[in-house]
């Protein structure tokens, strides 16, 4: 059994598994430009994941990572996006991610109900996971996590009584009121 290690940034512990390592690699590549495998290895080590260059090379290959030119002209690693977009793209800025969440909320959100720190969102059939992905990628600090089914999402607020404020915020986004 592998032990979880506590990362330096004080976040949740990360298990030493292939799946956890792949998730961290994707998170890092989506969060910031990474120019080399050695830079990526250092960022993973900062999160408590020690990897060899051979393992990292294999992981990048399994994830479909390629080097692309970002808007600044630098060659950086990128992975294919979730949601069917197989062409790797440079990470979106925070405002682009929030705009995507706003647009998808306006298109897909049918209702939002809150109870304590929970929010239940309803969408058309088949759309819940798409909206959940946009909410996750927006990395809103108030949201601890999302769970999505076919037409229902559950959001968990960090604030024990923050569900109603979160539901109201998402409903305002859906109505294009900022």
From Swiss-Prot:
A GO BP annotation: L-arginine biosynthetic process
The annotated region (Disordered) lies at: 1-20
The record's similarity note reads: Belongs to the ArgR family.
What UniProt keywords are attached to this protein's entry?
Amino-acid biosynthesis, Arginine biosynthesis, Cytoplasm, DNA-binding, Repressor, Transcription, Transcription regulation
Record-linked Pfam families: Arg_repressor, Arg_repressor_C
This protein's name:
Arginine repressor
* Function as written in the Swiss-Prot or TrEMBL entry: Regulates arginine biosynthesis genes.
Q: Which GO terms describe its molecular function?
A: arginine binding; DNA binding; DNA-binding transcription factor activity
Record's GO cellular component terms? cytoplasm
Q: In which pathway does it act?
A: Amino-acid biosynthesis; L-arginine biosynthesis [regulation]
Gene that encodes the chain: argR
Primary subcellular site in the record, as a coarse category = cytoplasm
